[in-house]
Amino acid sequence: MDKLDGSARLMIVSDLDQTMIDHNDPKNLSLLRFQALWESEFSQDSLLVFSTGRSPISYRGLRTQKPLITPDITIMSVGTVIAYGEEMIHDVGWAEFLSNKWDRDIPERSQGPHKVSFFVDKEGAREVMDSLPETLNRRGLDVKIIFSSGEALDVLPQGAGKGQALLYLLKKFNSDGKPPNSTLVCGDSGNDAELFSVPSVHGVMVSNAQEELLQWYEENARGNPMMIHATERCAAGIMQAIGHFNLGPNVSPRDLEFPYPKLDAIKPADVVVKFYVLYEKWRQGEVQKAPFIIQYLKRITHPNGTTIHPSGRECSLHASIDALSSCYADKQGKKFRVWVDRIVASSIGTINWLVRFDKWEMEGNVRYCCLTTLLLTMKPETEDGFEITHIHKTWLEGYSAGNEHACIL
């Protein structure tokens, strides 16, 4: 991981299903709230790690269904696969390590080279967990058995698992002289228990944690000040833990009332996130239809600033804002969401910033994405402290829209 020159301020290692993603929340509100917080406050100096029981194929499928941002590292198949960045470059060293005393064919696409999974009833799980390791050991295989979600039984190499994968990453960071300043692990089920056993990490069990994890907590971690059982579900519980352990800001830009307060220090990533949160709320009709909102958008954009649409058409920023003013509540009731991903802010001089990011819009099951570049000038003497001078957008291949109305700003 070469994203950071030094140690990560915070590394969050989170399970996905029913931890980061609440499958009982069809609007994905808690997920979007957390991700807005992450992109605005942490993305430039911290690391986000998804640690899931899903196989790489299943994980990629999930990304097409949910509005997920791109993690820095993805741990899949219950800790048996480690991949880096958007390209998901696999860690070959980890795969080679796991191959010791492990041998299997791969007859099913839902299985993995270092994971064999079954569904078993809860009553029979204990008997299988007691007898299977000994049986496999007699065949020269050194394995561990993990039961989670009340039905999933995973057979892994003894050196595998979510906890072992995290220890491997921490060892790599330490050897590079870049240990994270703080690490927060987050989970809801039995296959997450190993994460909480890693030394010196903070941990949060979300409020909807399952019975097997709660039982593990009672037997192994009750009274541990480094671990809490949140009162909030899923991603909201992760934000609760950030505040509880004083790991950084934990109020999402999506939870702020407009007008936004002026900050002492303007962060380019925060500017971008708030800009598009307001854009979404305007089109959803979740803010009042008031002239001062359009006036604010014009105030924070240069009068001669330009925007280049994905078609190549150029127009003034203020003209785009005028177009937006006529779109108030046009997406109300249409499951419309906007989020930004992969923000990279680069200083170009003393007061100017070039900010690159993916800007996503989703309506129902249809989504669009613009690869976006935004030029920002810091103006501490002004009411808002900054000014947007240019926005340039191109369609991400495979995610273009048939009309520019889908990507006004």
Curated annotation (Swiss-Prot):
One Pfam family recorded for the sequence: S6PP_C
The reactions it catalyses are: sucrose 6(F)-phosphate + H2O = sucrose + phosphate
Q: Any idea which UniProt keywords this protein has?
A: Hydrolase, Magnesium
What cofactors does this protein use? Mg(2+)
GO biological processes: sucrose biosynthetic process
Enzyme class, UniProt record, top EC level: hydrolase
The pathway this protein participates in, as annotated, is: Glycan biosynthesis; sucrose biosynthesis; sucrose from D-fructose 6-phosphate and UDP-alpha-D-glucose: step 2/2
Q: Which Gene3D superfamilies match?
A: 3.10.450.50, 3.90.1070.10, HAD superfamily/HAD-like
**This protein's name:** Probable sucrose-phosphatase 3
